[in-house]
Each structure stands twice: as C-alpha cells, then as structure tokens.
C-alpha cells in the first residue's frame, strides 16, 4: 500500500523502519526487510465481541448446539475451535473517585489542552471501590469508589481474584458467591468501558473510561494500526455498529472523549476526521496540529445517517437533519459527492431506495456490491475502501439477526432503553415487565399509499446491508493483496447493545452473527497461508453481569429465546438474570470488571508466555519523568496489555 503523501516506495520505507526500534513495549526484534520483501509478512487479526463475556458465549453456544458446559472454553462456536484459550483482565484507571476522568482539569475541552490537576500524583495501588449491596432493580453504580471514599486513593482499578473469582466461571452464580468466599458486588465496581479497553488492546496503555488512543494525561499513545502503517502493512476496521464508536475509534484516533464522533472540516479533535483525513499533519488545524494520518485501508461498518431517530413515515432517500449523529453532513456529502475530497476513499453506502419502493429487485444488494468492489481494489495502488451501512431505526447498527435468525428485531431500538431494568419500573423483588420498542420507521406513503409492512421492511433492510461476515470477507479479500501482511480488527459491537438491554434474544442472535464472521475468518485462513502466515485472536473488550441458571438449556429449548426475553419475567421461568440478585431478572444493565475469554491461534502468536505475568504501567507525566510500575497479574490469565504485546510481536515477525 502507498504510505500517504511521502512519495517513498512502500517496501523501501518498511525496510528502513524495520531497522529502528521505536516502541516502548517492544519485546522482540522487528522482522527482517528481506522477509517483508518476500511477501512473508504475518497477518494479524483480532476479533472483538463487544461485551462478549463467558456467559454470553455460553448462551450462544447452547442455543446453537443444545450442549451445556459449566467451566472452561466450552464448545459449539467457531471461536471455541481455536487451539489457544485463556482469559484476560480488563481494568483501567480511576481518578478522584471516577473511572471516566483524566488527570487533567478539563478546563479545555480539546484533547490534551487542559493542565494537570493541581497536586495530582499517580498512585499505582489498586482501587476498585467499596462494594455496597443494592437489592433494587436498577443499573445504578453499586460501589463507592475512588480516593474520596477509600483509604488508599489508588489510581488503578485492578482486579482481585479473591473477590471477583479466579476465572470467568467462578463463582458460577452470584447465588453461591458469598458461600465460596467471593463478593458478588465486587465486579460491579469501577467497571471499564469499550473505549479504555480498546485503547489497552491497541496500545498496551491502561487509561480511563472514554479514552480513545490517549493515556491518563490525554497524551497520544501510538496504536497498533499506526505501527502497522509504519511497517508498510495494510490495515482494516470492520464493525456491526457505527464506525465512529469506541472500539474502532480507539484504533484510529487520539481523543479524550469517545462521544466526539465527527467534526466539520478542518477541526480534527474527533474520531472520524482523524481516522480518514489524508492531509495530515495539518499546520492550519484550529485544534490538533499533532495528528498524523491513520487512514485505515478498509473501514466498514454502521453509522449511516438514514433515519437515525426512528421517525415514522420516512419518504426520502436522503438522511434527515437529525440523522447525522455518527457522521457530520459535511463529511458525508464530501464522501458521497466529491471525488477530490480530503479523504481519498472509494465510498459505498446502503441503498436509500428502501423508502421509495417495496420492489425488492430494485434494492441494491449491499453485501454483493461490497464483495465485488473489494475484489477490484488494490491497496498496493493506494486504493482505500469506506463502507457506511446500518438499518433504519437501529441507531446505525446492522440488521439484528435474533436467536432464530428471523431478524425480527430489525428496525427496533435496542440499546438500554426498553427492556432494561432502568425502564421497567420495577420494585424490589417484584415482577418486572419489559417495555420493548414495537414501532419501526415504516415508509407509510409508498406503494400507492399501501405503505410498508414489517416483513417488507425487514427484507429490504437485510438486502441493503451486508452482514458482518460479508464485511469481514470483503476486508480479508482486499487486505490480502498486500503481501507485506496486514492488521485487521473485526467487532461484533451489537452484542453489547443486546446485553445492555437485557435481551437474551438479541444477545444470542448477535453473538452467532459475530461467530459467523469468525468462521469466515477461520475458513479464509485455511486457504491463505494457514496458521504459519496468520494470527487470530477472538476476545471481548469487557464483560456484563449476566448469569445463566442450570435450567436455561431446558427452558430455551422449550420456549425459545424470544419468549425468554419478552414473556418470561422471572429468573425461574426465564432461566437467566442480570446482576447480583438471583431473584431479579433485571437487576443490572451494564458492564462488569470480570475477566473475559480469549481464544487464539497462530504460530507467530506467543500469547501463552504472558499468562500469569505482571502488567506494565508507565506513568508518563507531561513534561516530566516517566515512571514504570509492575502491577500484579492473575494466575492462569493475561491482561489486555499482554494481548497488545503479543499482536505487536506477531506483526513484526
């Protein structure tokens, strides 16, 4: 692939860089220039199921095969066929009693422009907070955390297996946690988010909730995507949710708040502008003159602005003014209408004709178009591909498959709004009735006034949008043309949305859709160099508090996931619950600090050497001295920073 505007031939540039060791966390030598020139570069692929903890994976595996397991890797999913298995800690930092704050004052909203909090001195002690039992069925924070309410004032959340459990399946249920010596409230304390965990996976740096590609002081941390660029490798990001969400965003931006999705040109303090601007660094930037090009070779995912607000009777192929949440109108219009825009991407998008016709033959097949385009483009010629998709009414996400694959949730809002505890008006230990969205944004004026049925809506949205597996295949097809190798991240982001909404139907469907993409990748590896040439890691960014009872397989088989979601309102009849209260179906609606599964394979991946090892943390005070600390590891587990190190080594092998 061409390296931006340098004019330097790729292999010469890559060979030069391979002589220089520039990263702090380097633990193995660079690959030799001759190996790269011979096309022997390793392909490193990480696939992240957002929120895909051990229990969510078990739910999907059980739904798919009917088999039940109570410990270990399990079976039934493609990811569980990978030979390597461990689990990872996911914790981040905490300042002043909050996990979402930096060590800066926040007086200037621009990333890194605020001064350090007066008197702040980093303390490497663990500080998860003090667990407090809450029986109420809410997703309120269950812990008093931070320096204001604990004695040590530490700035690392940490993970203590003596409190949370030595692995993701111990304790198997909060109902037995106390009897086994664990605290069922502990994993609620100071839980991480997708931004800081992705930052750790891509940079090796632990940071605060909201951070994308920056450290505790909002300083830039080089991402593995940037490193791959320097090595002359192609790069890709694929997601089932908006392309400017935290998991893809942390690989392609240095931003202090994950909600900075996009900005109008030439402002650069946003995820999308940093990701796709090619004319960087920009000496005329009003805010971020420090940003260099990220420019992923392939960027595919959701966030299309068509009808974000779930409004009814949408009758135009053009997005409404309220729809531009994940991408600005100026950016969208440049990509769509201006071939000489400042971004340099071949641009594909979902078909908007769905609001004009019910004739399925007139709807562009988004998956087929994407695969055909990817086959034509060549990163060695400087080609780049950006595909923007998302179903109407779903906050920019791809169509939701549901557990039985009927896509009956497509077009319905599904993120911590309707069936979660916070919206169910539950009383302590009382029966909770979910309130799911039932109104799709149907185009009521089309087809001579007959409008659009739910079945027509679903069929058209499915055709207009590729699946995650198709996007993964397209990315692999295009990136594989770079014989120097590539780095690729694929995210099943909507798994997290289903769990936030306490919706077992969507959890299972989204996980299986993600696993289909994993199978696509495994099959591709077998035909393209095998495990000598390719490395695959499948993991989660963080966990959620979901528990499956022993009755779950029987109840799922008898009733189906849709019934367990919408008509069975107690743990006894639904076979599962959310949170630390076994008698409440909806006792929580957010993440936990529990360890997450890691499935992996590839001869160039030496992740096993990090199992049980300490965790490096560098306190890099702006303009001052950097101090390196070693934090305690967990027996039989790795940390997400170790996954970064192992990927980096494989990338340079």
Label each residue range with its predicted role.
Residues 35-39:
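Boundary at the C-terminal end of the N-terminal hydrophobic targeting segment
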């Amino acid at each position: 692939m061409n390296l931006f505007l340098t004019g330097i031939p790729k292999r010469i540039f890559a060979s030069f860089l391979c002589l220089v060791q520039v990263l702090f966390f380097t633990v193995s030598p660079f690959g030799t220039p001759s190996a790269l020139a011979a096309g022997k570069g390793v392909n490193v692929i990480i696939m992240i199921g957002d929120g895909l903890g051990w229990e969510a994976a078990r739910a999907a595996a059980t739904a798919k095969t009917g088999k039940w397991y109570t410990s270990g890797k399990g079976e039934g999913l493609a990811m569980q066929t990978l030979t390597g298995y461990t689990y990872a800690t996911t914790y981040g930092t905490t300042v002043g009693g909050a996990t979402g704050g930096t060590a800066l004052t926040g007086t200037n909203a621009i990333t890194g422009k605020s001064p350090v909090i007066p008197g702040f001195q980093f303390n490497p002690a663990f500080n998860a907070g003090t667990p407090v039992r809450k029986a109420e069925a809410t997703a309120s924070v269950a812990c008093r955390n931070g320096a204001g309410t604990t004695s040590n004032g530490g700035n690392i959340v940490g993970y203590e297996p003596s409190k949370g459990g030595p692995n993701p399946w111990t304790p198997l249920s909060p109902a037995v946690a106390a009897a086994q010596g664990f605290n069922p409230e502990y994993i609620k304390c100071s839980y991480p988010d997708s931004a800081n965990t992705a930052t750790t996976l891509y940079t090796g740096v632990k940071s605060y909730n909201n951070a994308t590609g920056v450290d505790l002081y909002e300083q830039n941390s080089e991402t593995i995507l940037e490193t791959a660029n320097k090595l002359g490798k192609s790069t890709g990001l694929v997601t089932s949710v908006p392309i400017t969400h935290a998991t893809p965003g942390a690989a392609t931006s240095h931003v202090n708040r994950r909600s900075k999705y996009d900005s109008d040109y030439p402002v650069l303090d946003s995820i999308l502008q940093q990701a796709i601007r090619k004319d960087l660094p920009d000496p005329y930037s009003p805010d971020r003159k420090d940003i260099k090009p990220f420019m992923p070779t392939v960027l595919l995912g959701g966030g299309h602005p068509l009808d974000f607000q779930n409004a009814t009777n949408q009758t135009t192929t053009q997005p409404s003014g309220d729809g531009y949440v994940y991408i600005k109108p100026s950016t969208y219009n440049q990509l769509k209408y201006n071939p000489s825009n400042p971004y340099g991407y071949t641009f594909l998008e979902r078909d908007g004709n769905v609001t004009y016709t019910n004739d399925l033959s007139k709807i562009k097949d988004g998956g087929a178009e994407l695969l055909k385009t990817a086959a034509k483009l060549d990163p060695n010629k400087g080609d780049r591909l950006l595909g923007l998709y998302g179903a109407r009414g779903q906050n920019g996400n791809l169509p939701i498959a549901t557990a039985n694959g009927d896509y009956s949730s497509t077009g319905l809002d599904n993120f911590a709004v309707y069936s979660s505890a916070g919206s169910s008006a539950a009383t302590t230990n009382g029966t909770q009735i979910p309130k799911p969205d039932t109104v799709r944004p149907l185009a009521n004026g089309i087809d001579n006034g007959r409008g659009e049925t739910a079945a027509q809506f679903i069929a058209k949205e499915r055709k207009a949008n590729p699946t995650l597996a198709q996007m993964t295949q397209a990315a692999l097809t295009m990136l594989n043309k770079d014989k120097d190798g590539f780095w690729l991240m694929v995210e099943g982001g909507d798994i997290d949305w289903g769990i936030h909404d306490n919706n077992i139907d969507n959890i299972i469907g989204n996980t299986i859709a993600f696993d289909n993409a994993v199978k696509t990748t495994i099959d591709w590896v077998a035909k393209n160099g095998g495990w000598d040439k390719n490395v695959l890691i499948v993991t989660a960014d963080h966990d959620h508090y979901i528990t499956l009872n022993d009755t779950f397989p029987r109840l799922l088989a008898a009733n189906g996931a849709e019934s367990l979601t919408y008509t069975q309102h107690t743990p006894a009849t639904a076979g599962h619950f959310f949170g630390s209260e076994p008698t409440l179906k909806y006792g929580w609606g957010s993440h936990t600090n529990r360890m997450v599964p890691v499935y992996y394979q590839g001869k160039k991946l030496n992740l096993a050497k990090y199992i049980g090892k300490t965790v490096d943390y560098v306190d890099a005070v702006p303009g001052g001295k950097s101090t390196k600390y070693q934090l305690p590891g967990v027996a039989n587990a790795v940390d997400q920073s170790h996954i970064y190190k192992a990927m980096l080594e494989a990338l340079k092998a």
